[in-house]
Design a protein with these regions (language model features):
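A short, N-terminal "cap"/entry segment at the start of jelly-roll beta-barrel domains
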Residues: 1-69, 161-229, 244, 317-319
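Short histidine-centered beta-strand/loop micro-motifs
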Residues: 61-67, 83-89, 106, 114-115, ...
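His/acidic/aromatic-lined binding-pocket segments of jelly-roll/cupin-type domains
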Residues: 75-76, 86-88, 92-97, 115, ...
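Glycine- and acidic-residue-biased ligand/ion/polar-headgroup-sensing regions
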Residues: 79-80, 90-108, 239, 249-267
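Histidine-centered metal-chelating micro-motifs
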Residues: 82-85, 103, 123, 127-133, ...
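A short hydrophobic beta-strand segment most commonly corresponding to one strand
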Residues: 94-96, 123-124, 138-157, 253, ...
Length: 319
């Protein structure tokens, strides 16, 4: 890895481009009016913070949001006691909890199977499968949401308080408690079997240690939830570990969960770097040589989202 410590501190076109592909958490603002269908319904209150694309919001013209290609990336803050009405997308959508406990209801007609997700747990919602979510906990839920299209259609609501009873909507359309089941991975019921393929528990992830010195845990892709249009790994990067520049045929994005991450781009012999902290993101375009390194005093953890559901021929080499 070239020594960049003595590089001139001028702002080059490449550095400006890299900055334009970076979303810093402290420079962003949660939008409490991101979802028009929630207007006028206090029980549906939630806030969205957009990094890549608009997600389930129609606000695709947000100048602070990076243009999406194969997936969107956003955070959602769900206050205690609030819920999102059951709805369906034409593409897959995942929820990964960062803070709190989220209850997700998956809908089969008038029957609902609920699953609780804790920190670093993920649920991938199938395309066309109605689902909603609710915060029954004692602290706000912060979750990361990715939709498997750069320009997803607006969701289709199945049970919404604008035309259904409020409590019915809170139960995601289940007429009563007898129509609600808690997800069981041991159940032979077809609904539980379907959910079992799409629920990813952090505690069950088995790390795969790469020769480059970091660990990879698959969340979406082979060994995790089925990939449709994108894949996602959680990367554990010990302090002092670095990888050499690599190139993909599609875009990838890093979102820092813990610690600090140094990311570098290369072009025509020029090298530029940015350091990211918790909840910062960088979008690395297809064909761009890029690398990552942990210069911090503690191990770093970040998610890596790749704009293809197919295995990518990338070999990581230690720097």
């Amino acid at each position: 890895m070239p020594d960049t410590s003595l590089l001139p501190q001028t702002t080059s076109p490449l550095a400006r481009e890299m900055r334009s592909f970076t979303g810093l958490f402290t420079e962003k603002t949660f939008d409490w009016d991101a979802f028009p269908a929630s207007r006028g319904f206090p029980d549906l209150a939630r806030a969205q913070l957009r990094y890549i694309g608009a997600g389930g919001s129609p606000k695709s013209n947000d100048p602070s949001t990076l243009k999406a290609e194969h997936f969107t990336f956003s955070l959602v803050n769900q206050p205690v006691g609030k819920f999102a009405a059951s709805h369906a997308h034409e593409v897959v959508e995942h929820f990964m909890v960062l803070q709190g406990v989220l209850t997700v209801g998956t809908v089969w007609g008038d029957e609902v199977v609920e699953v609780k997700l804790g920190p670093k747990d993920l649920l991938l919602n199938k395309s066309g499968r109605p689902h909603g979510f609710r915060n029954d906990g004692v602290e706000p839920v912060l979750m990361q949401i990715t939709v498997g299209s750069g320009t997803p259609e607006m969701p289709v609501h199945v049970c919404h308080p604008k035309n259904k009873d409020l409590e019915l909507s809170r139960r995601f359309g289940a007429p009563g408690p007898e129509k609600i089941e808690l997800f069981s991975p041991e159940s032979a019921d077809r609904r539980h079997l379907e959910l079992g393929k799409h629920v990813v528990r952090h505690r069950d992830r088995v790390p795969v240690w790469e020769k480059a010195g970091f660990a990879r845990m698959t969340y979406v892709g082979e060994g995790g939830a089925p990939a449709h249009g994108y894949s996602m790994d959680m990367i554990h990067l010990p302090k002092g570990v670095a990888v050499r520049p690599y190139v993909r045929e599609v875009e990838d994005a890093y979102f820092v969960l813990e610690g600090a991450l140094t990311v570098g781009w290369e072009q025509d012999g020029e090298i530029v770097e940015r350091r990211l902290g918790a909840r910062d993101l960088i979008f690395n375009p297809a064909g761009r040589p890029h690398y990552f390194r942990n210069d911090g005093v503690v191990d770093a953890q970040f998610t890596m989202v790749v704009g293809s559901g197919k295995p990518q021929p990338v070999t990581f080499e230690a720097a």
